[in-house]
């Protein structure tokens, strides 16, 4: 699927390809000598990446891209965005290297973190209250479906990612700590304790500095993750000594899941132990990335490539907060728009702040449909810069939707459609042979449009009477439309008539004429091309609607 694309990918301007080129440069720089790197670059850039891998065995090792998840809560829009964007970079890298250099995308769950507070949206809070401070994979599951609260939320994450068709490998922090995967790097961290402290202590307040340790021991007596000072260290034995909650001094190994690391050192340790090559993160973590990068170097690793994406804002340009409940939830978007439109939205300018509220859904949906329609008409080089190539992992569907989402919304509004069957009565007449089976995307859009109309458009509809100038123009339009064949579905012809009426009646700008039509006929201030609406709604119904609003 990605083979044969390297000559085009080399010059593609879409941001995932920019990131992929940075990632490839890293792989060549870290794995090969200067002479080897020059030859490998020539081979890869000439479409012979498979030969480069055969020639240089170091390139056979998979490139690792990572995303992180905190399983104290459920997956959300940020989770989706990070996995979707990382997948886009992965696919761009695969195209850049003709899929010859293997890749892995790790979805890493920080499920050994201690439970800090009880989520508000859980009814059965008592088990969580009793287990506060314990690792999430030890906290009892309040839903009674899994071995732990962490296991429950991990299952939700996997179901979430599987539902969107992401290709990934799930990795549990608990498994890595307890299974020994992190042991070697943890011992290195113990040996380089002072170097880690040198990075971390300047970032902390005076009180926190006095007690800070990069190691968080698991209390043998209570099972809680403890934020306590490290009293003694024995590098040869691989142990630390701390004061337990009962006041006793306890010595534990840093290996085998007896401790976990504070999150910034933990991030660095994970990068080092897993050999992570790429990880992106939000703009709010810029300082954390810097600190973790320094610690990663202290541990003998190389910090991954990546970039900091901007955070989402609500309609008032305020940062979206789960606790405030402003902005959109994952469930909100998927009630009113297709997952593809959400992926499209995530693709757009990740380094620019974007508002995330309900009004963006129709716009994102229609822009996605426009790009999908343009894709088959584009040259191959342009296709790689088309967002739908990235949304669909290089395989956009052959067919989009012959009707825009905004037009569908107007159709729902005019027809007072409460179910898809009513809409299909119009759609099947406008698009010969169209059925929900032959036009699955159109059928899904119909459902989204009904939901959006019922929840947002219908409650805010405000009809008004036309003024004298508008009334005269609408009567003129009524006469002209009635003069057309009643079965006319020529959207361009109808649009020309509407345009001519507005011009003849002196509307300047003409936008005021179209706005008047929507406000008088549909109770809203804007909509798609009126000719397209009339063609799909039906000329007879359109003229009847005009006559009804003019009371003629």
Curated annotation (Swiss-Prot):
InterPro entries: aa-tRNA-synth_I_codon-bd_sub2, aa-tRNA-synth_I_CS, aa_tRNA-synth_I_cd-bd_sf, Lys-tRNA-ligase, Rossmann-like_a/b/a_fold. One of its GO terms (biological process) is lysyl-tRNA aminoacylation. It is found in: Cytoplasm. PROSITE patterns: AA_TRNA_LIGASE_I (PS00178). A motif ('KMSKS' region) lies at residues 319-323. The keyword Transmembrane does not apply. Its main location: cytoplasm. It catalyses: tRNA(Lys) + L-lysine + ATP = L-lysyl-tRNA(Lys) + AMP + diphosphate. A motif ('HIGH' region) lies at residues 71-79. ATP binds at residue 322. Its EC number is 6.1.1.6. The keyword Nucleotide-binding applies. One of its GO terms (cellular component) is cytoplasm. Keywords: Aminoacyl-tRNA synthetase, ATP-binding, Cytoplasm, Ligase, Nucleotide-binding, Protein biosynthesis. It comes from the Bacteria. GO terms for molecular function: ATP binding; lysine-tRNA ligase activity; tRNA binding. PANTHER family: LYSINE--TRNA LIGASE. HAMAP family: Lys_tRNA_synth_class1 (MF_00177). Belongs to the class-I aminoacyl-tRNA synthetase family. This is Lysine--tRNA ligase.
């Amino acid at each position: 699927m990605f083979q044969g694309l390297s000559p085009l990918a080399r010059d593609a301007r879409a941001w995932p390809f920019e990131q992929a080129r940075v990632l490839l440069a890293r792989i060549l720089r870290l794995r090969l000598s200067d002479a080897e790197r020059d030859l490998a670059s020539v081979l890869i850039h000439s479409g012979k990446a498979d030969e480069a891998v055969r020639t240089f065995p170091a390139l056979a090792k998979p490139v690792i891209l990572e995303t992180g998840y905190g399983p104290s809560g459920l997956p959300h829009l940020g989770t989706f965005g990070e996995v979707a964007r990382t997948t886009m970079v992965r696919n761009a890298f695969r195209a850049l290297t003709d899929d010859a250099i293997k890749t892995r995308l790790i979805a890493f769950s920080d499920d050994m973190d201690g439970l800090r507070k009880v989520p508000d949206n859980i009814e059965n809070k008592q088990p969580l209250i009793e287990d506060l401070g314990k690792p999430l994979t030890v906290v009892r599951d309040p839903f009674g479906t899994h071995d732990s609260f962490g296991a429950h939320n991990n299952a939700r994450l996997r179901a979430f990612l599987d539902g969107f068709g992401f290709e990934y490998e799930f990795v549990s922090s608990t498994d890595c700590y307890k299974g020994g995967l992190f042991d070697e790097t943890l011992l290195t961290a113990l040996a380089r304790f002072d170097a880690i402290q040198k990075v971390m202590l300047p970032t902390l307040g005076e009180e926190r500095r006095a007690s800070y340790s990069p190691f968080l021991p698991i209390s043998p007596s209570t099972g809680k993750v403890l934020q306590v000072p490290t009293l003694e260290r024995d590098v040869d034995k691989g142990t630390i000594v701390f004061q337990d909650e009962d006041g006793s001094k306890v010595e534990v190994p840093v290996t085998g899941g007896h401790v976990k690391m504070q999150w910034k050192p933990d991030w660095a340790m994970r990068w080092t132990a897993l050999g992570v090559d790429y990880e992106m993160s939000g703009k709010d973590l810029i300082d954390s990335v810097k600190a973790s990068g320094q610690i990663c170097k202290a541990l003998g690793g190389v910090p991954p490539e990546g970039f900091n994406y901007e955070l989402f804002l609500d309609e008032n340009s305020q940062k979206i907060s789960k606790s405030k409940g402003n902005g959109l939830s994952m469930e909100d978007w998927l009630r009113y728009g297709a997952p593809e439109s959400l992926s499209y939205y995530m693709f757009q300018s990740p380094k620019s702040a974007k508002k995330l509220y309900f009004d963006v859904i129709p716009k994102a949906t229609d822009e996605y449909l426009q790009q999908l329609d343009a894709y088959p008409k584009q040259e191959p080089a342009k296709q790689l810069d088309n967002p739908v190539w990235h949304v669909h992992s290089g395989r956009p569907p052959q067919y989009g939707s012959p009707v825009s989402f905004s037009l569908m919304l107007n159709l729902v509004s005019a027809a007072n459609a409460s179910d898809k069957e009513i809409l299909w009565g119009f759609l099947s007449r406008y698009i010969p042979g169209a059925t929900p089976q032959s036009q699955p995307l159109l059928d899904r859009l119909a459902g989204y449009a009904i939901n959006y109309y019922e929840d947002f458009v219908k409650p805010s509809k405000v009809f008004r009477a036309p003024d004298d100038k508008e009334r005269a123009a609408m009567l003129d339009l009524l006469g002209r439309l009635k003069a057309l064949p009643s079965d006319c579905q020529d959207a361009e012809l109808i649009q020309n008539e509407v345009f001519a009426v507005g011009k003849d009646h002196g509307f300047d700008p003409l936008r005021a004429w179209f706005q008047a039509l929507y406000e008088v006929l549909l109770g809203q201030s804007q909509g798609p091309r009126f000719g397209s609406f009339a063609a799909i709604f039906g000329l007879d119904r359109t003229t009847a609607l005009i006559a009804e609003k003019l009371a003629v």
